[in-house]
A protein has these predicted regions:
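A general structural detector for well-ordered alpha-helical segments in enzyme core domains, enriched
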Residues: 39, 93, 97, 126-130
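Accessory, usually C-terminal, subdomains that scaffold auxiliary metal cofactors
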Residues: 41, 84-88, 117-123
Length: 150
């Protein structure tokens, strides 16, 4: 089943799934569990939502989303439990997130980058997966200024 996560305990379940996934990829989360709770319940109460996919009572996929300007839903984190990949929980999650965006009458659903190594390489598999939902890619401009420090 697909559910909006309402409690801190549910957010912890999501965070656990996220950490397992990141560890498998050799990555670390930008945010701690405490950060996510602070962001959701203190700083961006209306702008951040969490969603999960459950098999019975076990969360097998989840997402943290940002709602921008009443027109955009952006997935900040998407994660699933690798043990349940044969059930396609990520597909199920994204389908229902898109449904939520439609119900909220939002204009755009974005689900982030498809690059690795700070944008140096395109992850073709991830790109194809996202394009499978009828999405189109867009390029994000990046600006930098080199500073000469003595």
């Amino acid at each position: 089943t697909f559910e909006k996560l309402e409690t801190k305990e549910q957010v912890m379940q999501f965070y656990d799934v996220l950490q397992i996934n990141l560890k498998k990829l050799g990555l670390k989360s930008v945010h701690s569990y405490e950060d996510l709770i602070d962001l959701k319940y203190n700083r961006f109460v209306q702008e951040i939502e969490f969603y999960g996919v459950f098999l019975e009572s076990k969360m097998i996929a989840g997402s943290m989303v940002f709602l921008f300007d009443g027109s955009i839903m952006h997935t900040q984190y998407l994660s699933s439990d690798e043990q349940y990949q044969k059930l396609f929980p990520m597909d199920f999650l994204i389908y229902h997130l898109i449904e939520c965006a439609v119900e909220k009458q939002l204009e755009l659903f974005t689900f982030g980058i498809c690059t690795e190594n700070q944008g140096r390489y395109l992850n073709f598999g991830l790109s194809r997966f996202k394009e499978g939902f009828g999405t189109e890619f867009c390029l994000n401009k990046s600006f930098e200024k080199r500073l000469l420090l003595s």
